[in-house]
Amino acid sequence: MKVLRKGDRGDEVCQLQTLLNLCGYDVGKPDGIFGNNTFNQVVKFQKDNCLDSDGIVGKNTWAELFSKYSPPIPYKTIPMPTANKSRAAATPVMNAVENATGVRSQLLLTFASIESAFDYEIKAKTSSATGWFQFLTGTWKTMIENYGMKYGVLTDPTGALRKDPRISALMGAELIKENMNILRPVLKREPTDTDLYLAHFFGPGAARRFLTTGQNELAATHFPKEAQANPSIFYNKDGSPKTIQEVYNLMDGKVAAHRK
């Protein structure tokens, strides 16, 4: 973990503040700013634990914080699937993840089926996408930074934990919740599984624009970058461009094929 000092800002400071709060040292709502209150609570924690009370969060302070931290929903309470590449074996995992996150297990099963056919060890040949939910390295790093401590995952510098189906499913659920929160106010309704898959596939920003563009507009005109990367989605076999509605119907059919 990074050495932190008063005046620092960023995700690591948020993690520090979260840990301090969980250990009983009240810094208020984590804001990512290492200010006076955070400094004072760090010093207090260090004094209480016989550490150098200089307010600098180095290796020893991080280690002591982590040793005292007990996550509310540790990922190890989620069962491992009894087999790989199996929807039936994945179902108890997703049911437990639903209980932990509030995201419907049916939705999680649909996405894992589309992305990896329930192969939690799979890695894409053309990108860094890995595991049940095919997380890219950068996205995974962000998810672990934002949600890892909630489930007892403190760090994963190599991204190896993407192949742990329990953690992949938990992070997949948290990403789905993020996308729900982005799409809901724009759509003024609950997003469907197809809406959410669009956000997963194209990114939430592009999905938001896609879902608010006229149905008869040519999709490639509005999304040239996505069309270039995914020509079979945006163009018919004869080369003619598809409309927004036609692309949506295609994606909806893909999602429907994995609903059970």
Curated annotation (Swiss-Prot):
Site feature (Important for the enzymatic reaction) residues: Y147, E178, Y197
InterPro entries from the UniProt entry: Lysozyme-like_dom_sf (IPR023346), Peptidoglycan-bd-like (IPR002477), PGBD-like_sf (IPR036365), PGBDSf (IPR036366), Transglycosylase_SLT_dom_1 (IPR008258)
Annotated segments matching region Peptidoglycan binding: 9-69
Pfam families in the cross-refs: PG_binding_1, SLT
Keywords annotated in UniProt: Antimicrobial, Bacteriolytic enzyme, Cytolysis, Host cell lysis by virus, Lyase, Viral release from host cell
EC numbers on record: 4.2.2.n1
pH dependence: Optimum pH is 6.2.
Region entry Peptidoglycan hydrolase activity, spans: 106-210
Top EC category: lyase
Domains (record comment): The N-terminus is responsible for primary binding to the peptidoglycan. The C-terminus contains the peptidoglycan hydrolase activity.
Annotated function: Endolysin with transglycosylase activity that degrades host peptidoglycans and participates in the sequential events which lead to the programmed host cell lysis releasing the mature viral particles. Binds and cleaves peptidoglycans found in Gram-negative bacteria and that contain the A1 chemotype peptidoglycan and fully N-acetylated glucosamine.
Name of the featured protein: Endolysin gp144
Lineage: Viruses, Duplodnaviria, Heunggongvirae, Uroviricota, Caudoviricetes
